[in-house]
Amino acid sequence: MIQQAIAKVLEGEDLTRAEAASVMTEIADGGATPAQSGAFLAALRMKGETVDEIAGAADVMRQRADRVRVDRDVFIDTCGTGGDGRHTFNISTTAAFVAAGAGVCVAKHGNRAVSSRSGSADVLAALGVNVDADKETVERCIEEVGIGFLFAVRLHPAFKAIAGVRRELGVRTIFNLLGPLANPAGARHQVLGVYEARWVPVLGGVLAALGAAHAFVVHGEGLDEIAVTGMTHVCEVRDGQVERYTIRPEDLGLPRRDAAELVGGDAAANARIVTDVLEGQAGGPRDAVLANAAAALVCAGAAKDLRDGVARAARSIDSGAAREKLRQLVAATTVPA
């Protein structure tokens, strides 16, 4: 199948959802050579990935994931694509703790760094979380603490083989978009940041096709986050309906911030910023977290709108609830000596 798919894509023709799924299955099963996999990914990138192609690939990633059981009707993910190249601190990871502190169940999917020096797994490890905890521990964390970390590299074993091909290609491919679409717990409520604004409507269409209950796809001022530095492009998906709009910090009751305030560093430096935010320190990092946590609360049904979400997120931080969720997650994932 992959040879025919390469030929079709090189002619500029789009694949159907089923065809894309067949190719991804072949890659996952080891039926495609590294050369074929690389050619397919590069050809698809040159043509431009469509909603159906991304949805078909995501179908297979979801099917092949090592499933994490969550016994809740509503739980969220705040996983973005990464790769925006702006080297901010880990905003969406911090927002996950704030959402959890506000009473929302979180199954946080993430990985090591893509373009920054600190991905969600890196900063969580620096904060003391055992990101390599086994699946049973992760499930227990979600159930008892209300937040758990789903480490992508451990829970998507079928796609380990493609990592080398992606590394050798050295360019973004469909896999850069797939991670946030393949939460191993099957989260249907999520905030998904994308590294370029052009992907906002595309990923919105994909989430609608995949059956998202309530989700936000966002890109703000070059970031795969809701921006407090300027305008954010939003695609809100709700039970198959897709709405596009833009928001500014002022719409959320937040001041406009300078991008330099949000720049992070390595995992240790970012862990200090996360800690400062969770301890209530005012400033740009806090406001960025409030904006993104607000969207998480809205998609979970825990806030009526983004302004209300900001207020509830602020209470989660200022009451100490968000910080306590981090402490509990560290304790729950740490193996006793």
Swiss-Prot record:
Binding site for anthranilate 2: R166
GO terms for MF: anthranilate phosphoribosyltransferase activity; magnesium ion binding
Cofactor list: Mg(2+)
SUPFAM superfamilies found in the cross-reference section: Nucleoside phosphorylase/phosphoribosyltransferase catalytic domain, Nucleoside phosphorylase/phosphoribosyltransferase N-terminal domain
Enzyme Commission code: 2.4.2.18
Positions that bind 5-phospho-alpha-D-ribose 1-diphosphate: 80, 83-84, 88, 90-93, 108-116, 120
Binding of Mg(2+) 1, residues: S92, E225
Highest taxon in the source lineage: Bacteria
Record pathway: Amino-acid biosynthesis; L-tryptophan biosynthesis; L-tryptophan from chorismate: step 2/5
Entry similarity comment: Belongs to the anthranilate phosphoribosyltransferase family.
Protein name: Anthranilate phosphoribosyltransferase
Name of encoding gene: trpD
